[in-house]
Amino acid sequence: MNIFLDIFSFILFFGILTIISPILGKYMADIYEGRVHPSLKPIRYVEKTIYKILGIDESKEMNWKEYLYALLSFNFLGFLVLFLTLLFQKYLPLNQYHIPNMSWDLAFNTAVSFVTNTNWQAYAGETQATYFSQITGLALQNFLSAASGIVVALVLIRAFARKNTIYLGNFYVDFTRTILYVLLPVAFFSALFLVSQGVIQNFSHYKTIELLEPYKDSKNIITTQTLPMGPVASQEAIKLLGTNGGGFFNANSAHPFENPTPLSNVFEAFLIILIPASLVFTFGYMIKDKRQGWFLYSVMLFVLMLFMGIQYYFEWFGNPIVKKLGIEGPYLIGKELRFGIGGTVLFSSITTATSCGAVNSMLDSFTPLGGLVPMSLISLGEIIFGGVGSGLYGMIAMVIIAVFVAGLMIGRTPEYLNKKIESREMWSSVVITLVSGITALLLTTLALYTKWGLSSMSNPGPHGLSEVLYAYISTSNNSGSAFAGLNANTVFYNITTGLAMLIGRFIPIIAVFYMASSLSLKKHVPPSPGTLPTHTLVFGVWLVFIIIVVGALTFLPAFSLGPILEHMLMLEGVTL
């Protein structure tokens, strides 16, 4: 393991991202504006056939209420189908391992999780979900929930790009194009690459193999091991591309059947961040100001690399208690040796910044401040690239807040992208920014105040608090990753984390539509000498300041009692 090699790999990774994401962003802008390249005529034929079968008029656009109603209805139907599938999976096909039905609370939690693009997993995929549930339920929702997030971002983009109109697009058209032109093709070729790296793709029975080194437990000598099988590669690709994060196996992307090589690890991390980064450029192209796309990308990339550097430092130099025992080298507890510190930090930072939730390591085993980094990235509210779609509209809400505060300081009515920012936009932006944080803190308080919440904690002291806090920050921000020391498969946690996911997903979406309904009706205001430019270095510094301040004000007290206190105790050599 070499620090300089890791730094070089980070630079190469983000260099390639900076080259590819504008290209994909331009492609997506063309698709959503109806400019289909002649080479895509076969897909266009499929698209038209779908509209004909379903009776959809692609030329008819919707106002914000019609669009929102279609989106919410579609998501509710998806939840209902998935909930019933999990509740009765024992009786459905492709259940070679005779897996029983999920309990009602676990089925509710899992269905909500995948419909909201959170993919919080209170179950183990290899023992509690059948092949049928994985394919027709969970993998399907990986496509649908990702497309749902992207179309919400499209509505907000159009609200800025258009003027004096109530129409914001057609949900069914946007949704269909997202699936056909973006998610399916990229996921298909990504799955083929993952298979080439050793990710499995089959419908076989689980394999029983002889151990090379049998071992003895309290009762018997164990000589065999059962290896789970399944159609993993096809689900792995969309799990990452759609920033979903729910693994086929309980170990997620730390499992060698999901992520077998260092190359697959880098590729999977790239898949996670690809669409969130590209959508920023789609935004710039569709509003006819590419500078805005590059500006947002630069701010997001700066904050991500800052947090990555902090995490790398604490994980490389490790735990002083361990070093006192004469054990030198980087802190590898909870990490896969085939990835090392660099591959682990790259993956964990990207997956939490994008609110994906996939993990290639055990976050619960990181150093206190190393574990604070993913928690902090999630708690910023899905704005450092963020989930597909949700990251863009979350960042735009933060930009509007920054513009508003700057406008107050200079005594001008704030404007963003030639549109005046008034009470409706500010109200919506505040809701988008704060609702997940408030939800997480309230539910954490409830869990720590009740016996149902406390009974699931396996660790005392500040780390136990961190596990509970992380659970609700993760679910309310639709991330899905966890500090795994918490037993989340209880009625209390299944219901409360389910509510956190619903609130964190749909309240901001409603606020986005409310904002878009106002912006689309406004005319474009020509820039004046006093207009605040929102693509400059000065505004970038201001935006980063606002992002950090809002995040710190929301969670700093809770972080002080959790990971920060745990770090102080570690420096004193105290363990709990």
Curated annotation (Swiss-Prot):
The keyword Cell inner membrane applies. Pfam families: KdpA. Its main location: membrane. The chain crosses the membrane at residues 3-23, 68-88, 137-157, 179-199, 267-287, 294-314, 339-359, 369-389, 391-411, 430-450, 495-515, 537-557. One of its GO terms (cellular component) is plasma membrane. Keywords: Cell inner membrane, Cell membrane, Ion transport, Membrane, Potassium, Potassium transport, Transmembrane, Transmembrane helix, Transport. One of its GO terms (molecular function) is P-type potassium transmembrane transporter activity. Signal peptide: none annotated. InterPro entries: KdpA (IPR004623). NCBIfam families: kdpA. Belongs to the KdpA family. Part of the high-affinity ATP-driven potassium transport (or Kdp) system, which catalyzes the hydrolysis of ATP coupled with the electrogenic transport of potassium into the cytoplasm. This subunit binds the periplasmic potassium ions and delivers the ions to the membrane domain of KdpB through an intramembrane tunnel. This is Potassium-transporting ATPase potassium-binding subunit.
